[in-house]
């Protein structure tokens, strides 16, 4: 089974605009989100929404709407700040605050977390212990694909348990394309032909591996404002946005998806889960 996951954030949060400036930008969250929700309803699919605490405070009715529709509400931190740019104390405060905000809205325990920009890296593995201490049991923050922003290249390509604290890690799912390792979701989904992602999921299914697909609401909104930014980031953010909707429609029609909590539960019920020391991620 595969996971359909959404980082619930607005377009300006995805391009690293300072937290203090967010109110100055046009809010367009529902422009893309409503299109995505129509697809999920059409294909009878439940998703996990990794939600910013700030979004929860601003749109509590939306969060309740998502939860009532059968989607899982998970944490994406509060301010979309990268974990490795925070102190442990600041990180603890953010994930505790966000957990309380989201649970107060839905009445449902928040157990899963994804760091903004997959920013649990070699420099911020301390965050895994804090997640456990703050009541989280699933983390989806580590990417085996190393980029200028994130990644731990020797991350196991499977769901696994962190030996030291019991956290279940569901890393970014990848597939092989010739000599390259690519992620499944986000900019990879738009930049390459749909068949690349489809073949990636088939490749993983044939190997008996679960897949974590990820996307953002602003990727369904090709008309959100274009602003000046670093060249590489601008390319990955804005390129081929009009492909997201038709590609996602095909994906949801050809593969089955569920929430991360349900998929992890099913995975554990089928047999033993690999356990790795956090030291393997530091190697």
For each of these PLM feature ranges, what is it?
Residues 1-112, 117-177, 196-283:
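Catalytic alpha-helical scaffold of carbohydrate-active enzymes acting on polysaccharides/glycoconjugates
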Residues 23, 181-191:
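Surface-exposed cleft-lining segments at the edges of enzyme active sites
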């Amino acid at each position: 089974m595969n996971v359909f996951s959404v980082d619930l954030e607005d377009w300006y949060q995805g391009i690293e605009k300072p937290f203090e400036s967010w109110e100055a930008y046009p809010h367009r969250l529902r422009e893309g989100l409503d299109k995505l929700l129509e697809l999920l309803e059409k294909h009878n699919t439940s998703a996990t929404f990794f939600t910013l605490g700030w979004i929860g405070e601003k749109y509590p009715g939306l969060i309740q709407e998502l939860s009532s529709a059968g989607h899982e509400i998970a944490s994406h931190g509060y301010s979309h700040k990268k974990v490795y740019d925070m102190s442990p104390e600041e990180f603890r405060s953010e994930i505790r605050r966000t957990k309380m905000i989201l649970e107060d809205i839905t009445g449902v325990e928040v157990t899963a977390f994804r760091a903004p920009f997959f920013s649990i890296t070699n420099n911020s593995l301390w965050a895994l212990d804090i997640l456990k201490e703050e009541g989280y049991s699933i983390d989806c923050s580590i990417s085996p694909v190393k980029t200028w922003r994130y990644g731990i290249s020797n991350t196991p390509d499977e769901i696994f348990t962190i030996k030291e604290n019991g956290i279940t890690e569901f890393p970014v799912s990848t597939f092989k394309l010739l000599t390259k390792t690519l992620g499944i979701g986000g900019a990879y989904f738009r930049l390459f032909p749909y068949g690349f992602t489809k073949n990636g999921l088939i490749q993983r299914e044939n190997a008996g591996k679960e897949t974590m697909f990820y996307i953002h609401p602003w990727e369904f909104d090709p008309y959100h404002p274009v602003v000046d930014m670093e060249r590489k980031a601008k390319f990955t953010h804005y390129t081929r946005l009009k492909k997201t909707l038709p590609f996602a429609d095909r994906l949801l029609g050809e593969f089955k998806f569920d929430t991360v909590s349900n998929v992890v539960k099913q995975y554990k019920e089928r047999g033993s889960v690999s356990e790795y020391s956090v030291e393997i991620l530091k190697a």
